[in-house]
Amino acid sequence: MSWKPSSVANPPNKMRTLILIPTETEAAPLRAACPDAPVRIAGVGMAAAAAATARIIAEEHPDRLILAGIAGASDRSVAVCEVVAVAGERIAELPGKYAVRYAADFIPAGLRTVESNTTNRTGVAASGTQIENMEGAAFL
């Protein structure tokens, strides 16, 4: 299957979408399946993801960004290899009043929604989250 940016990702008179993925290793399956997919590498961690997101917005002016990648499940209700959409993101290491929830603005497309926490190390869980990643809060 070939991705058709002009007709699928960016139909006439529609929003221009870019897909941010932290690493080339994570992006490889999408690039192999859809060589023309509008993929950009965001980098690993909050600082890299925030900088890449800001740069991509400033340089490419997309209408919509999608952050995709591999996350760890901190809740057994999330199956291995399950695709989910993040409804909200927290930074797990921030204490008390600083532990705010960043709401995601997304189109669920039939995906199960979960809460996520962005963490710099494993084993740090924010209350009520099902998955963890290293970039989400910086992206939102």
List each language-model region with its residue ranges:
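Gly/serine-rich nucleotide phosphate-binding loop at the start of the catalytic core
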Residues: 20-23
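Glycine-rich phosphate- or other oxyanion-binding loops that anchor nucleotides, phosphorylated ligands
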Residues: 14-16, 26-140
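Acidic, Ala/Val/Gly-enriched low-complexity intrinsically disordered segments
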Residues: 8-9
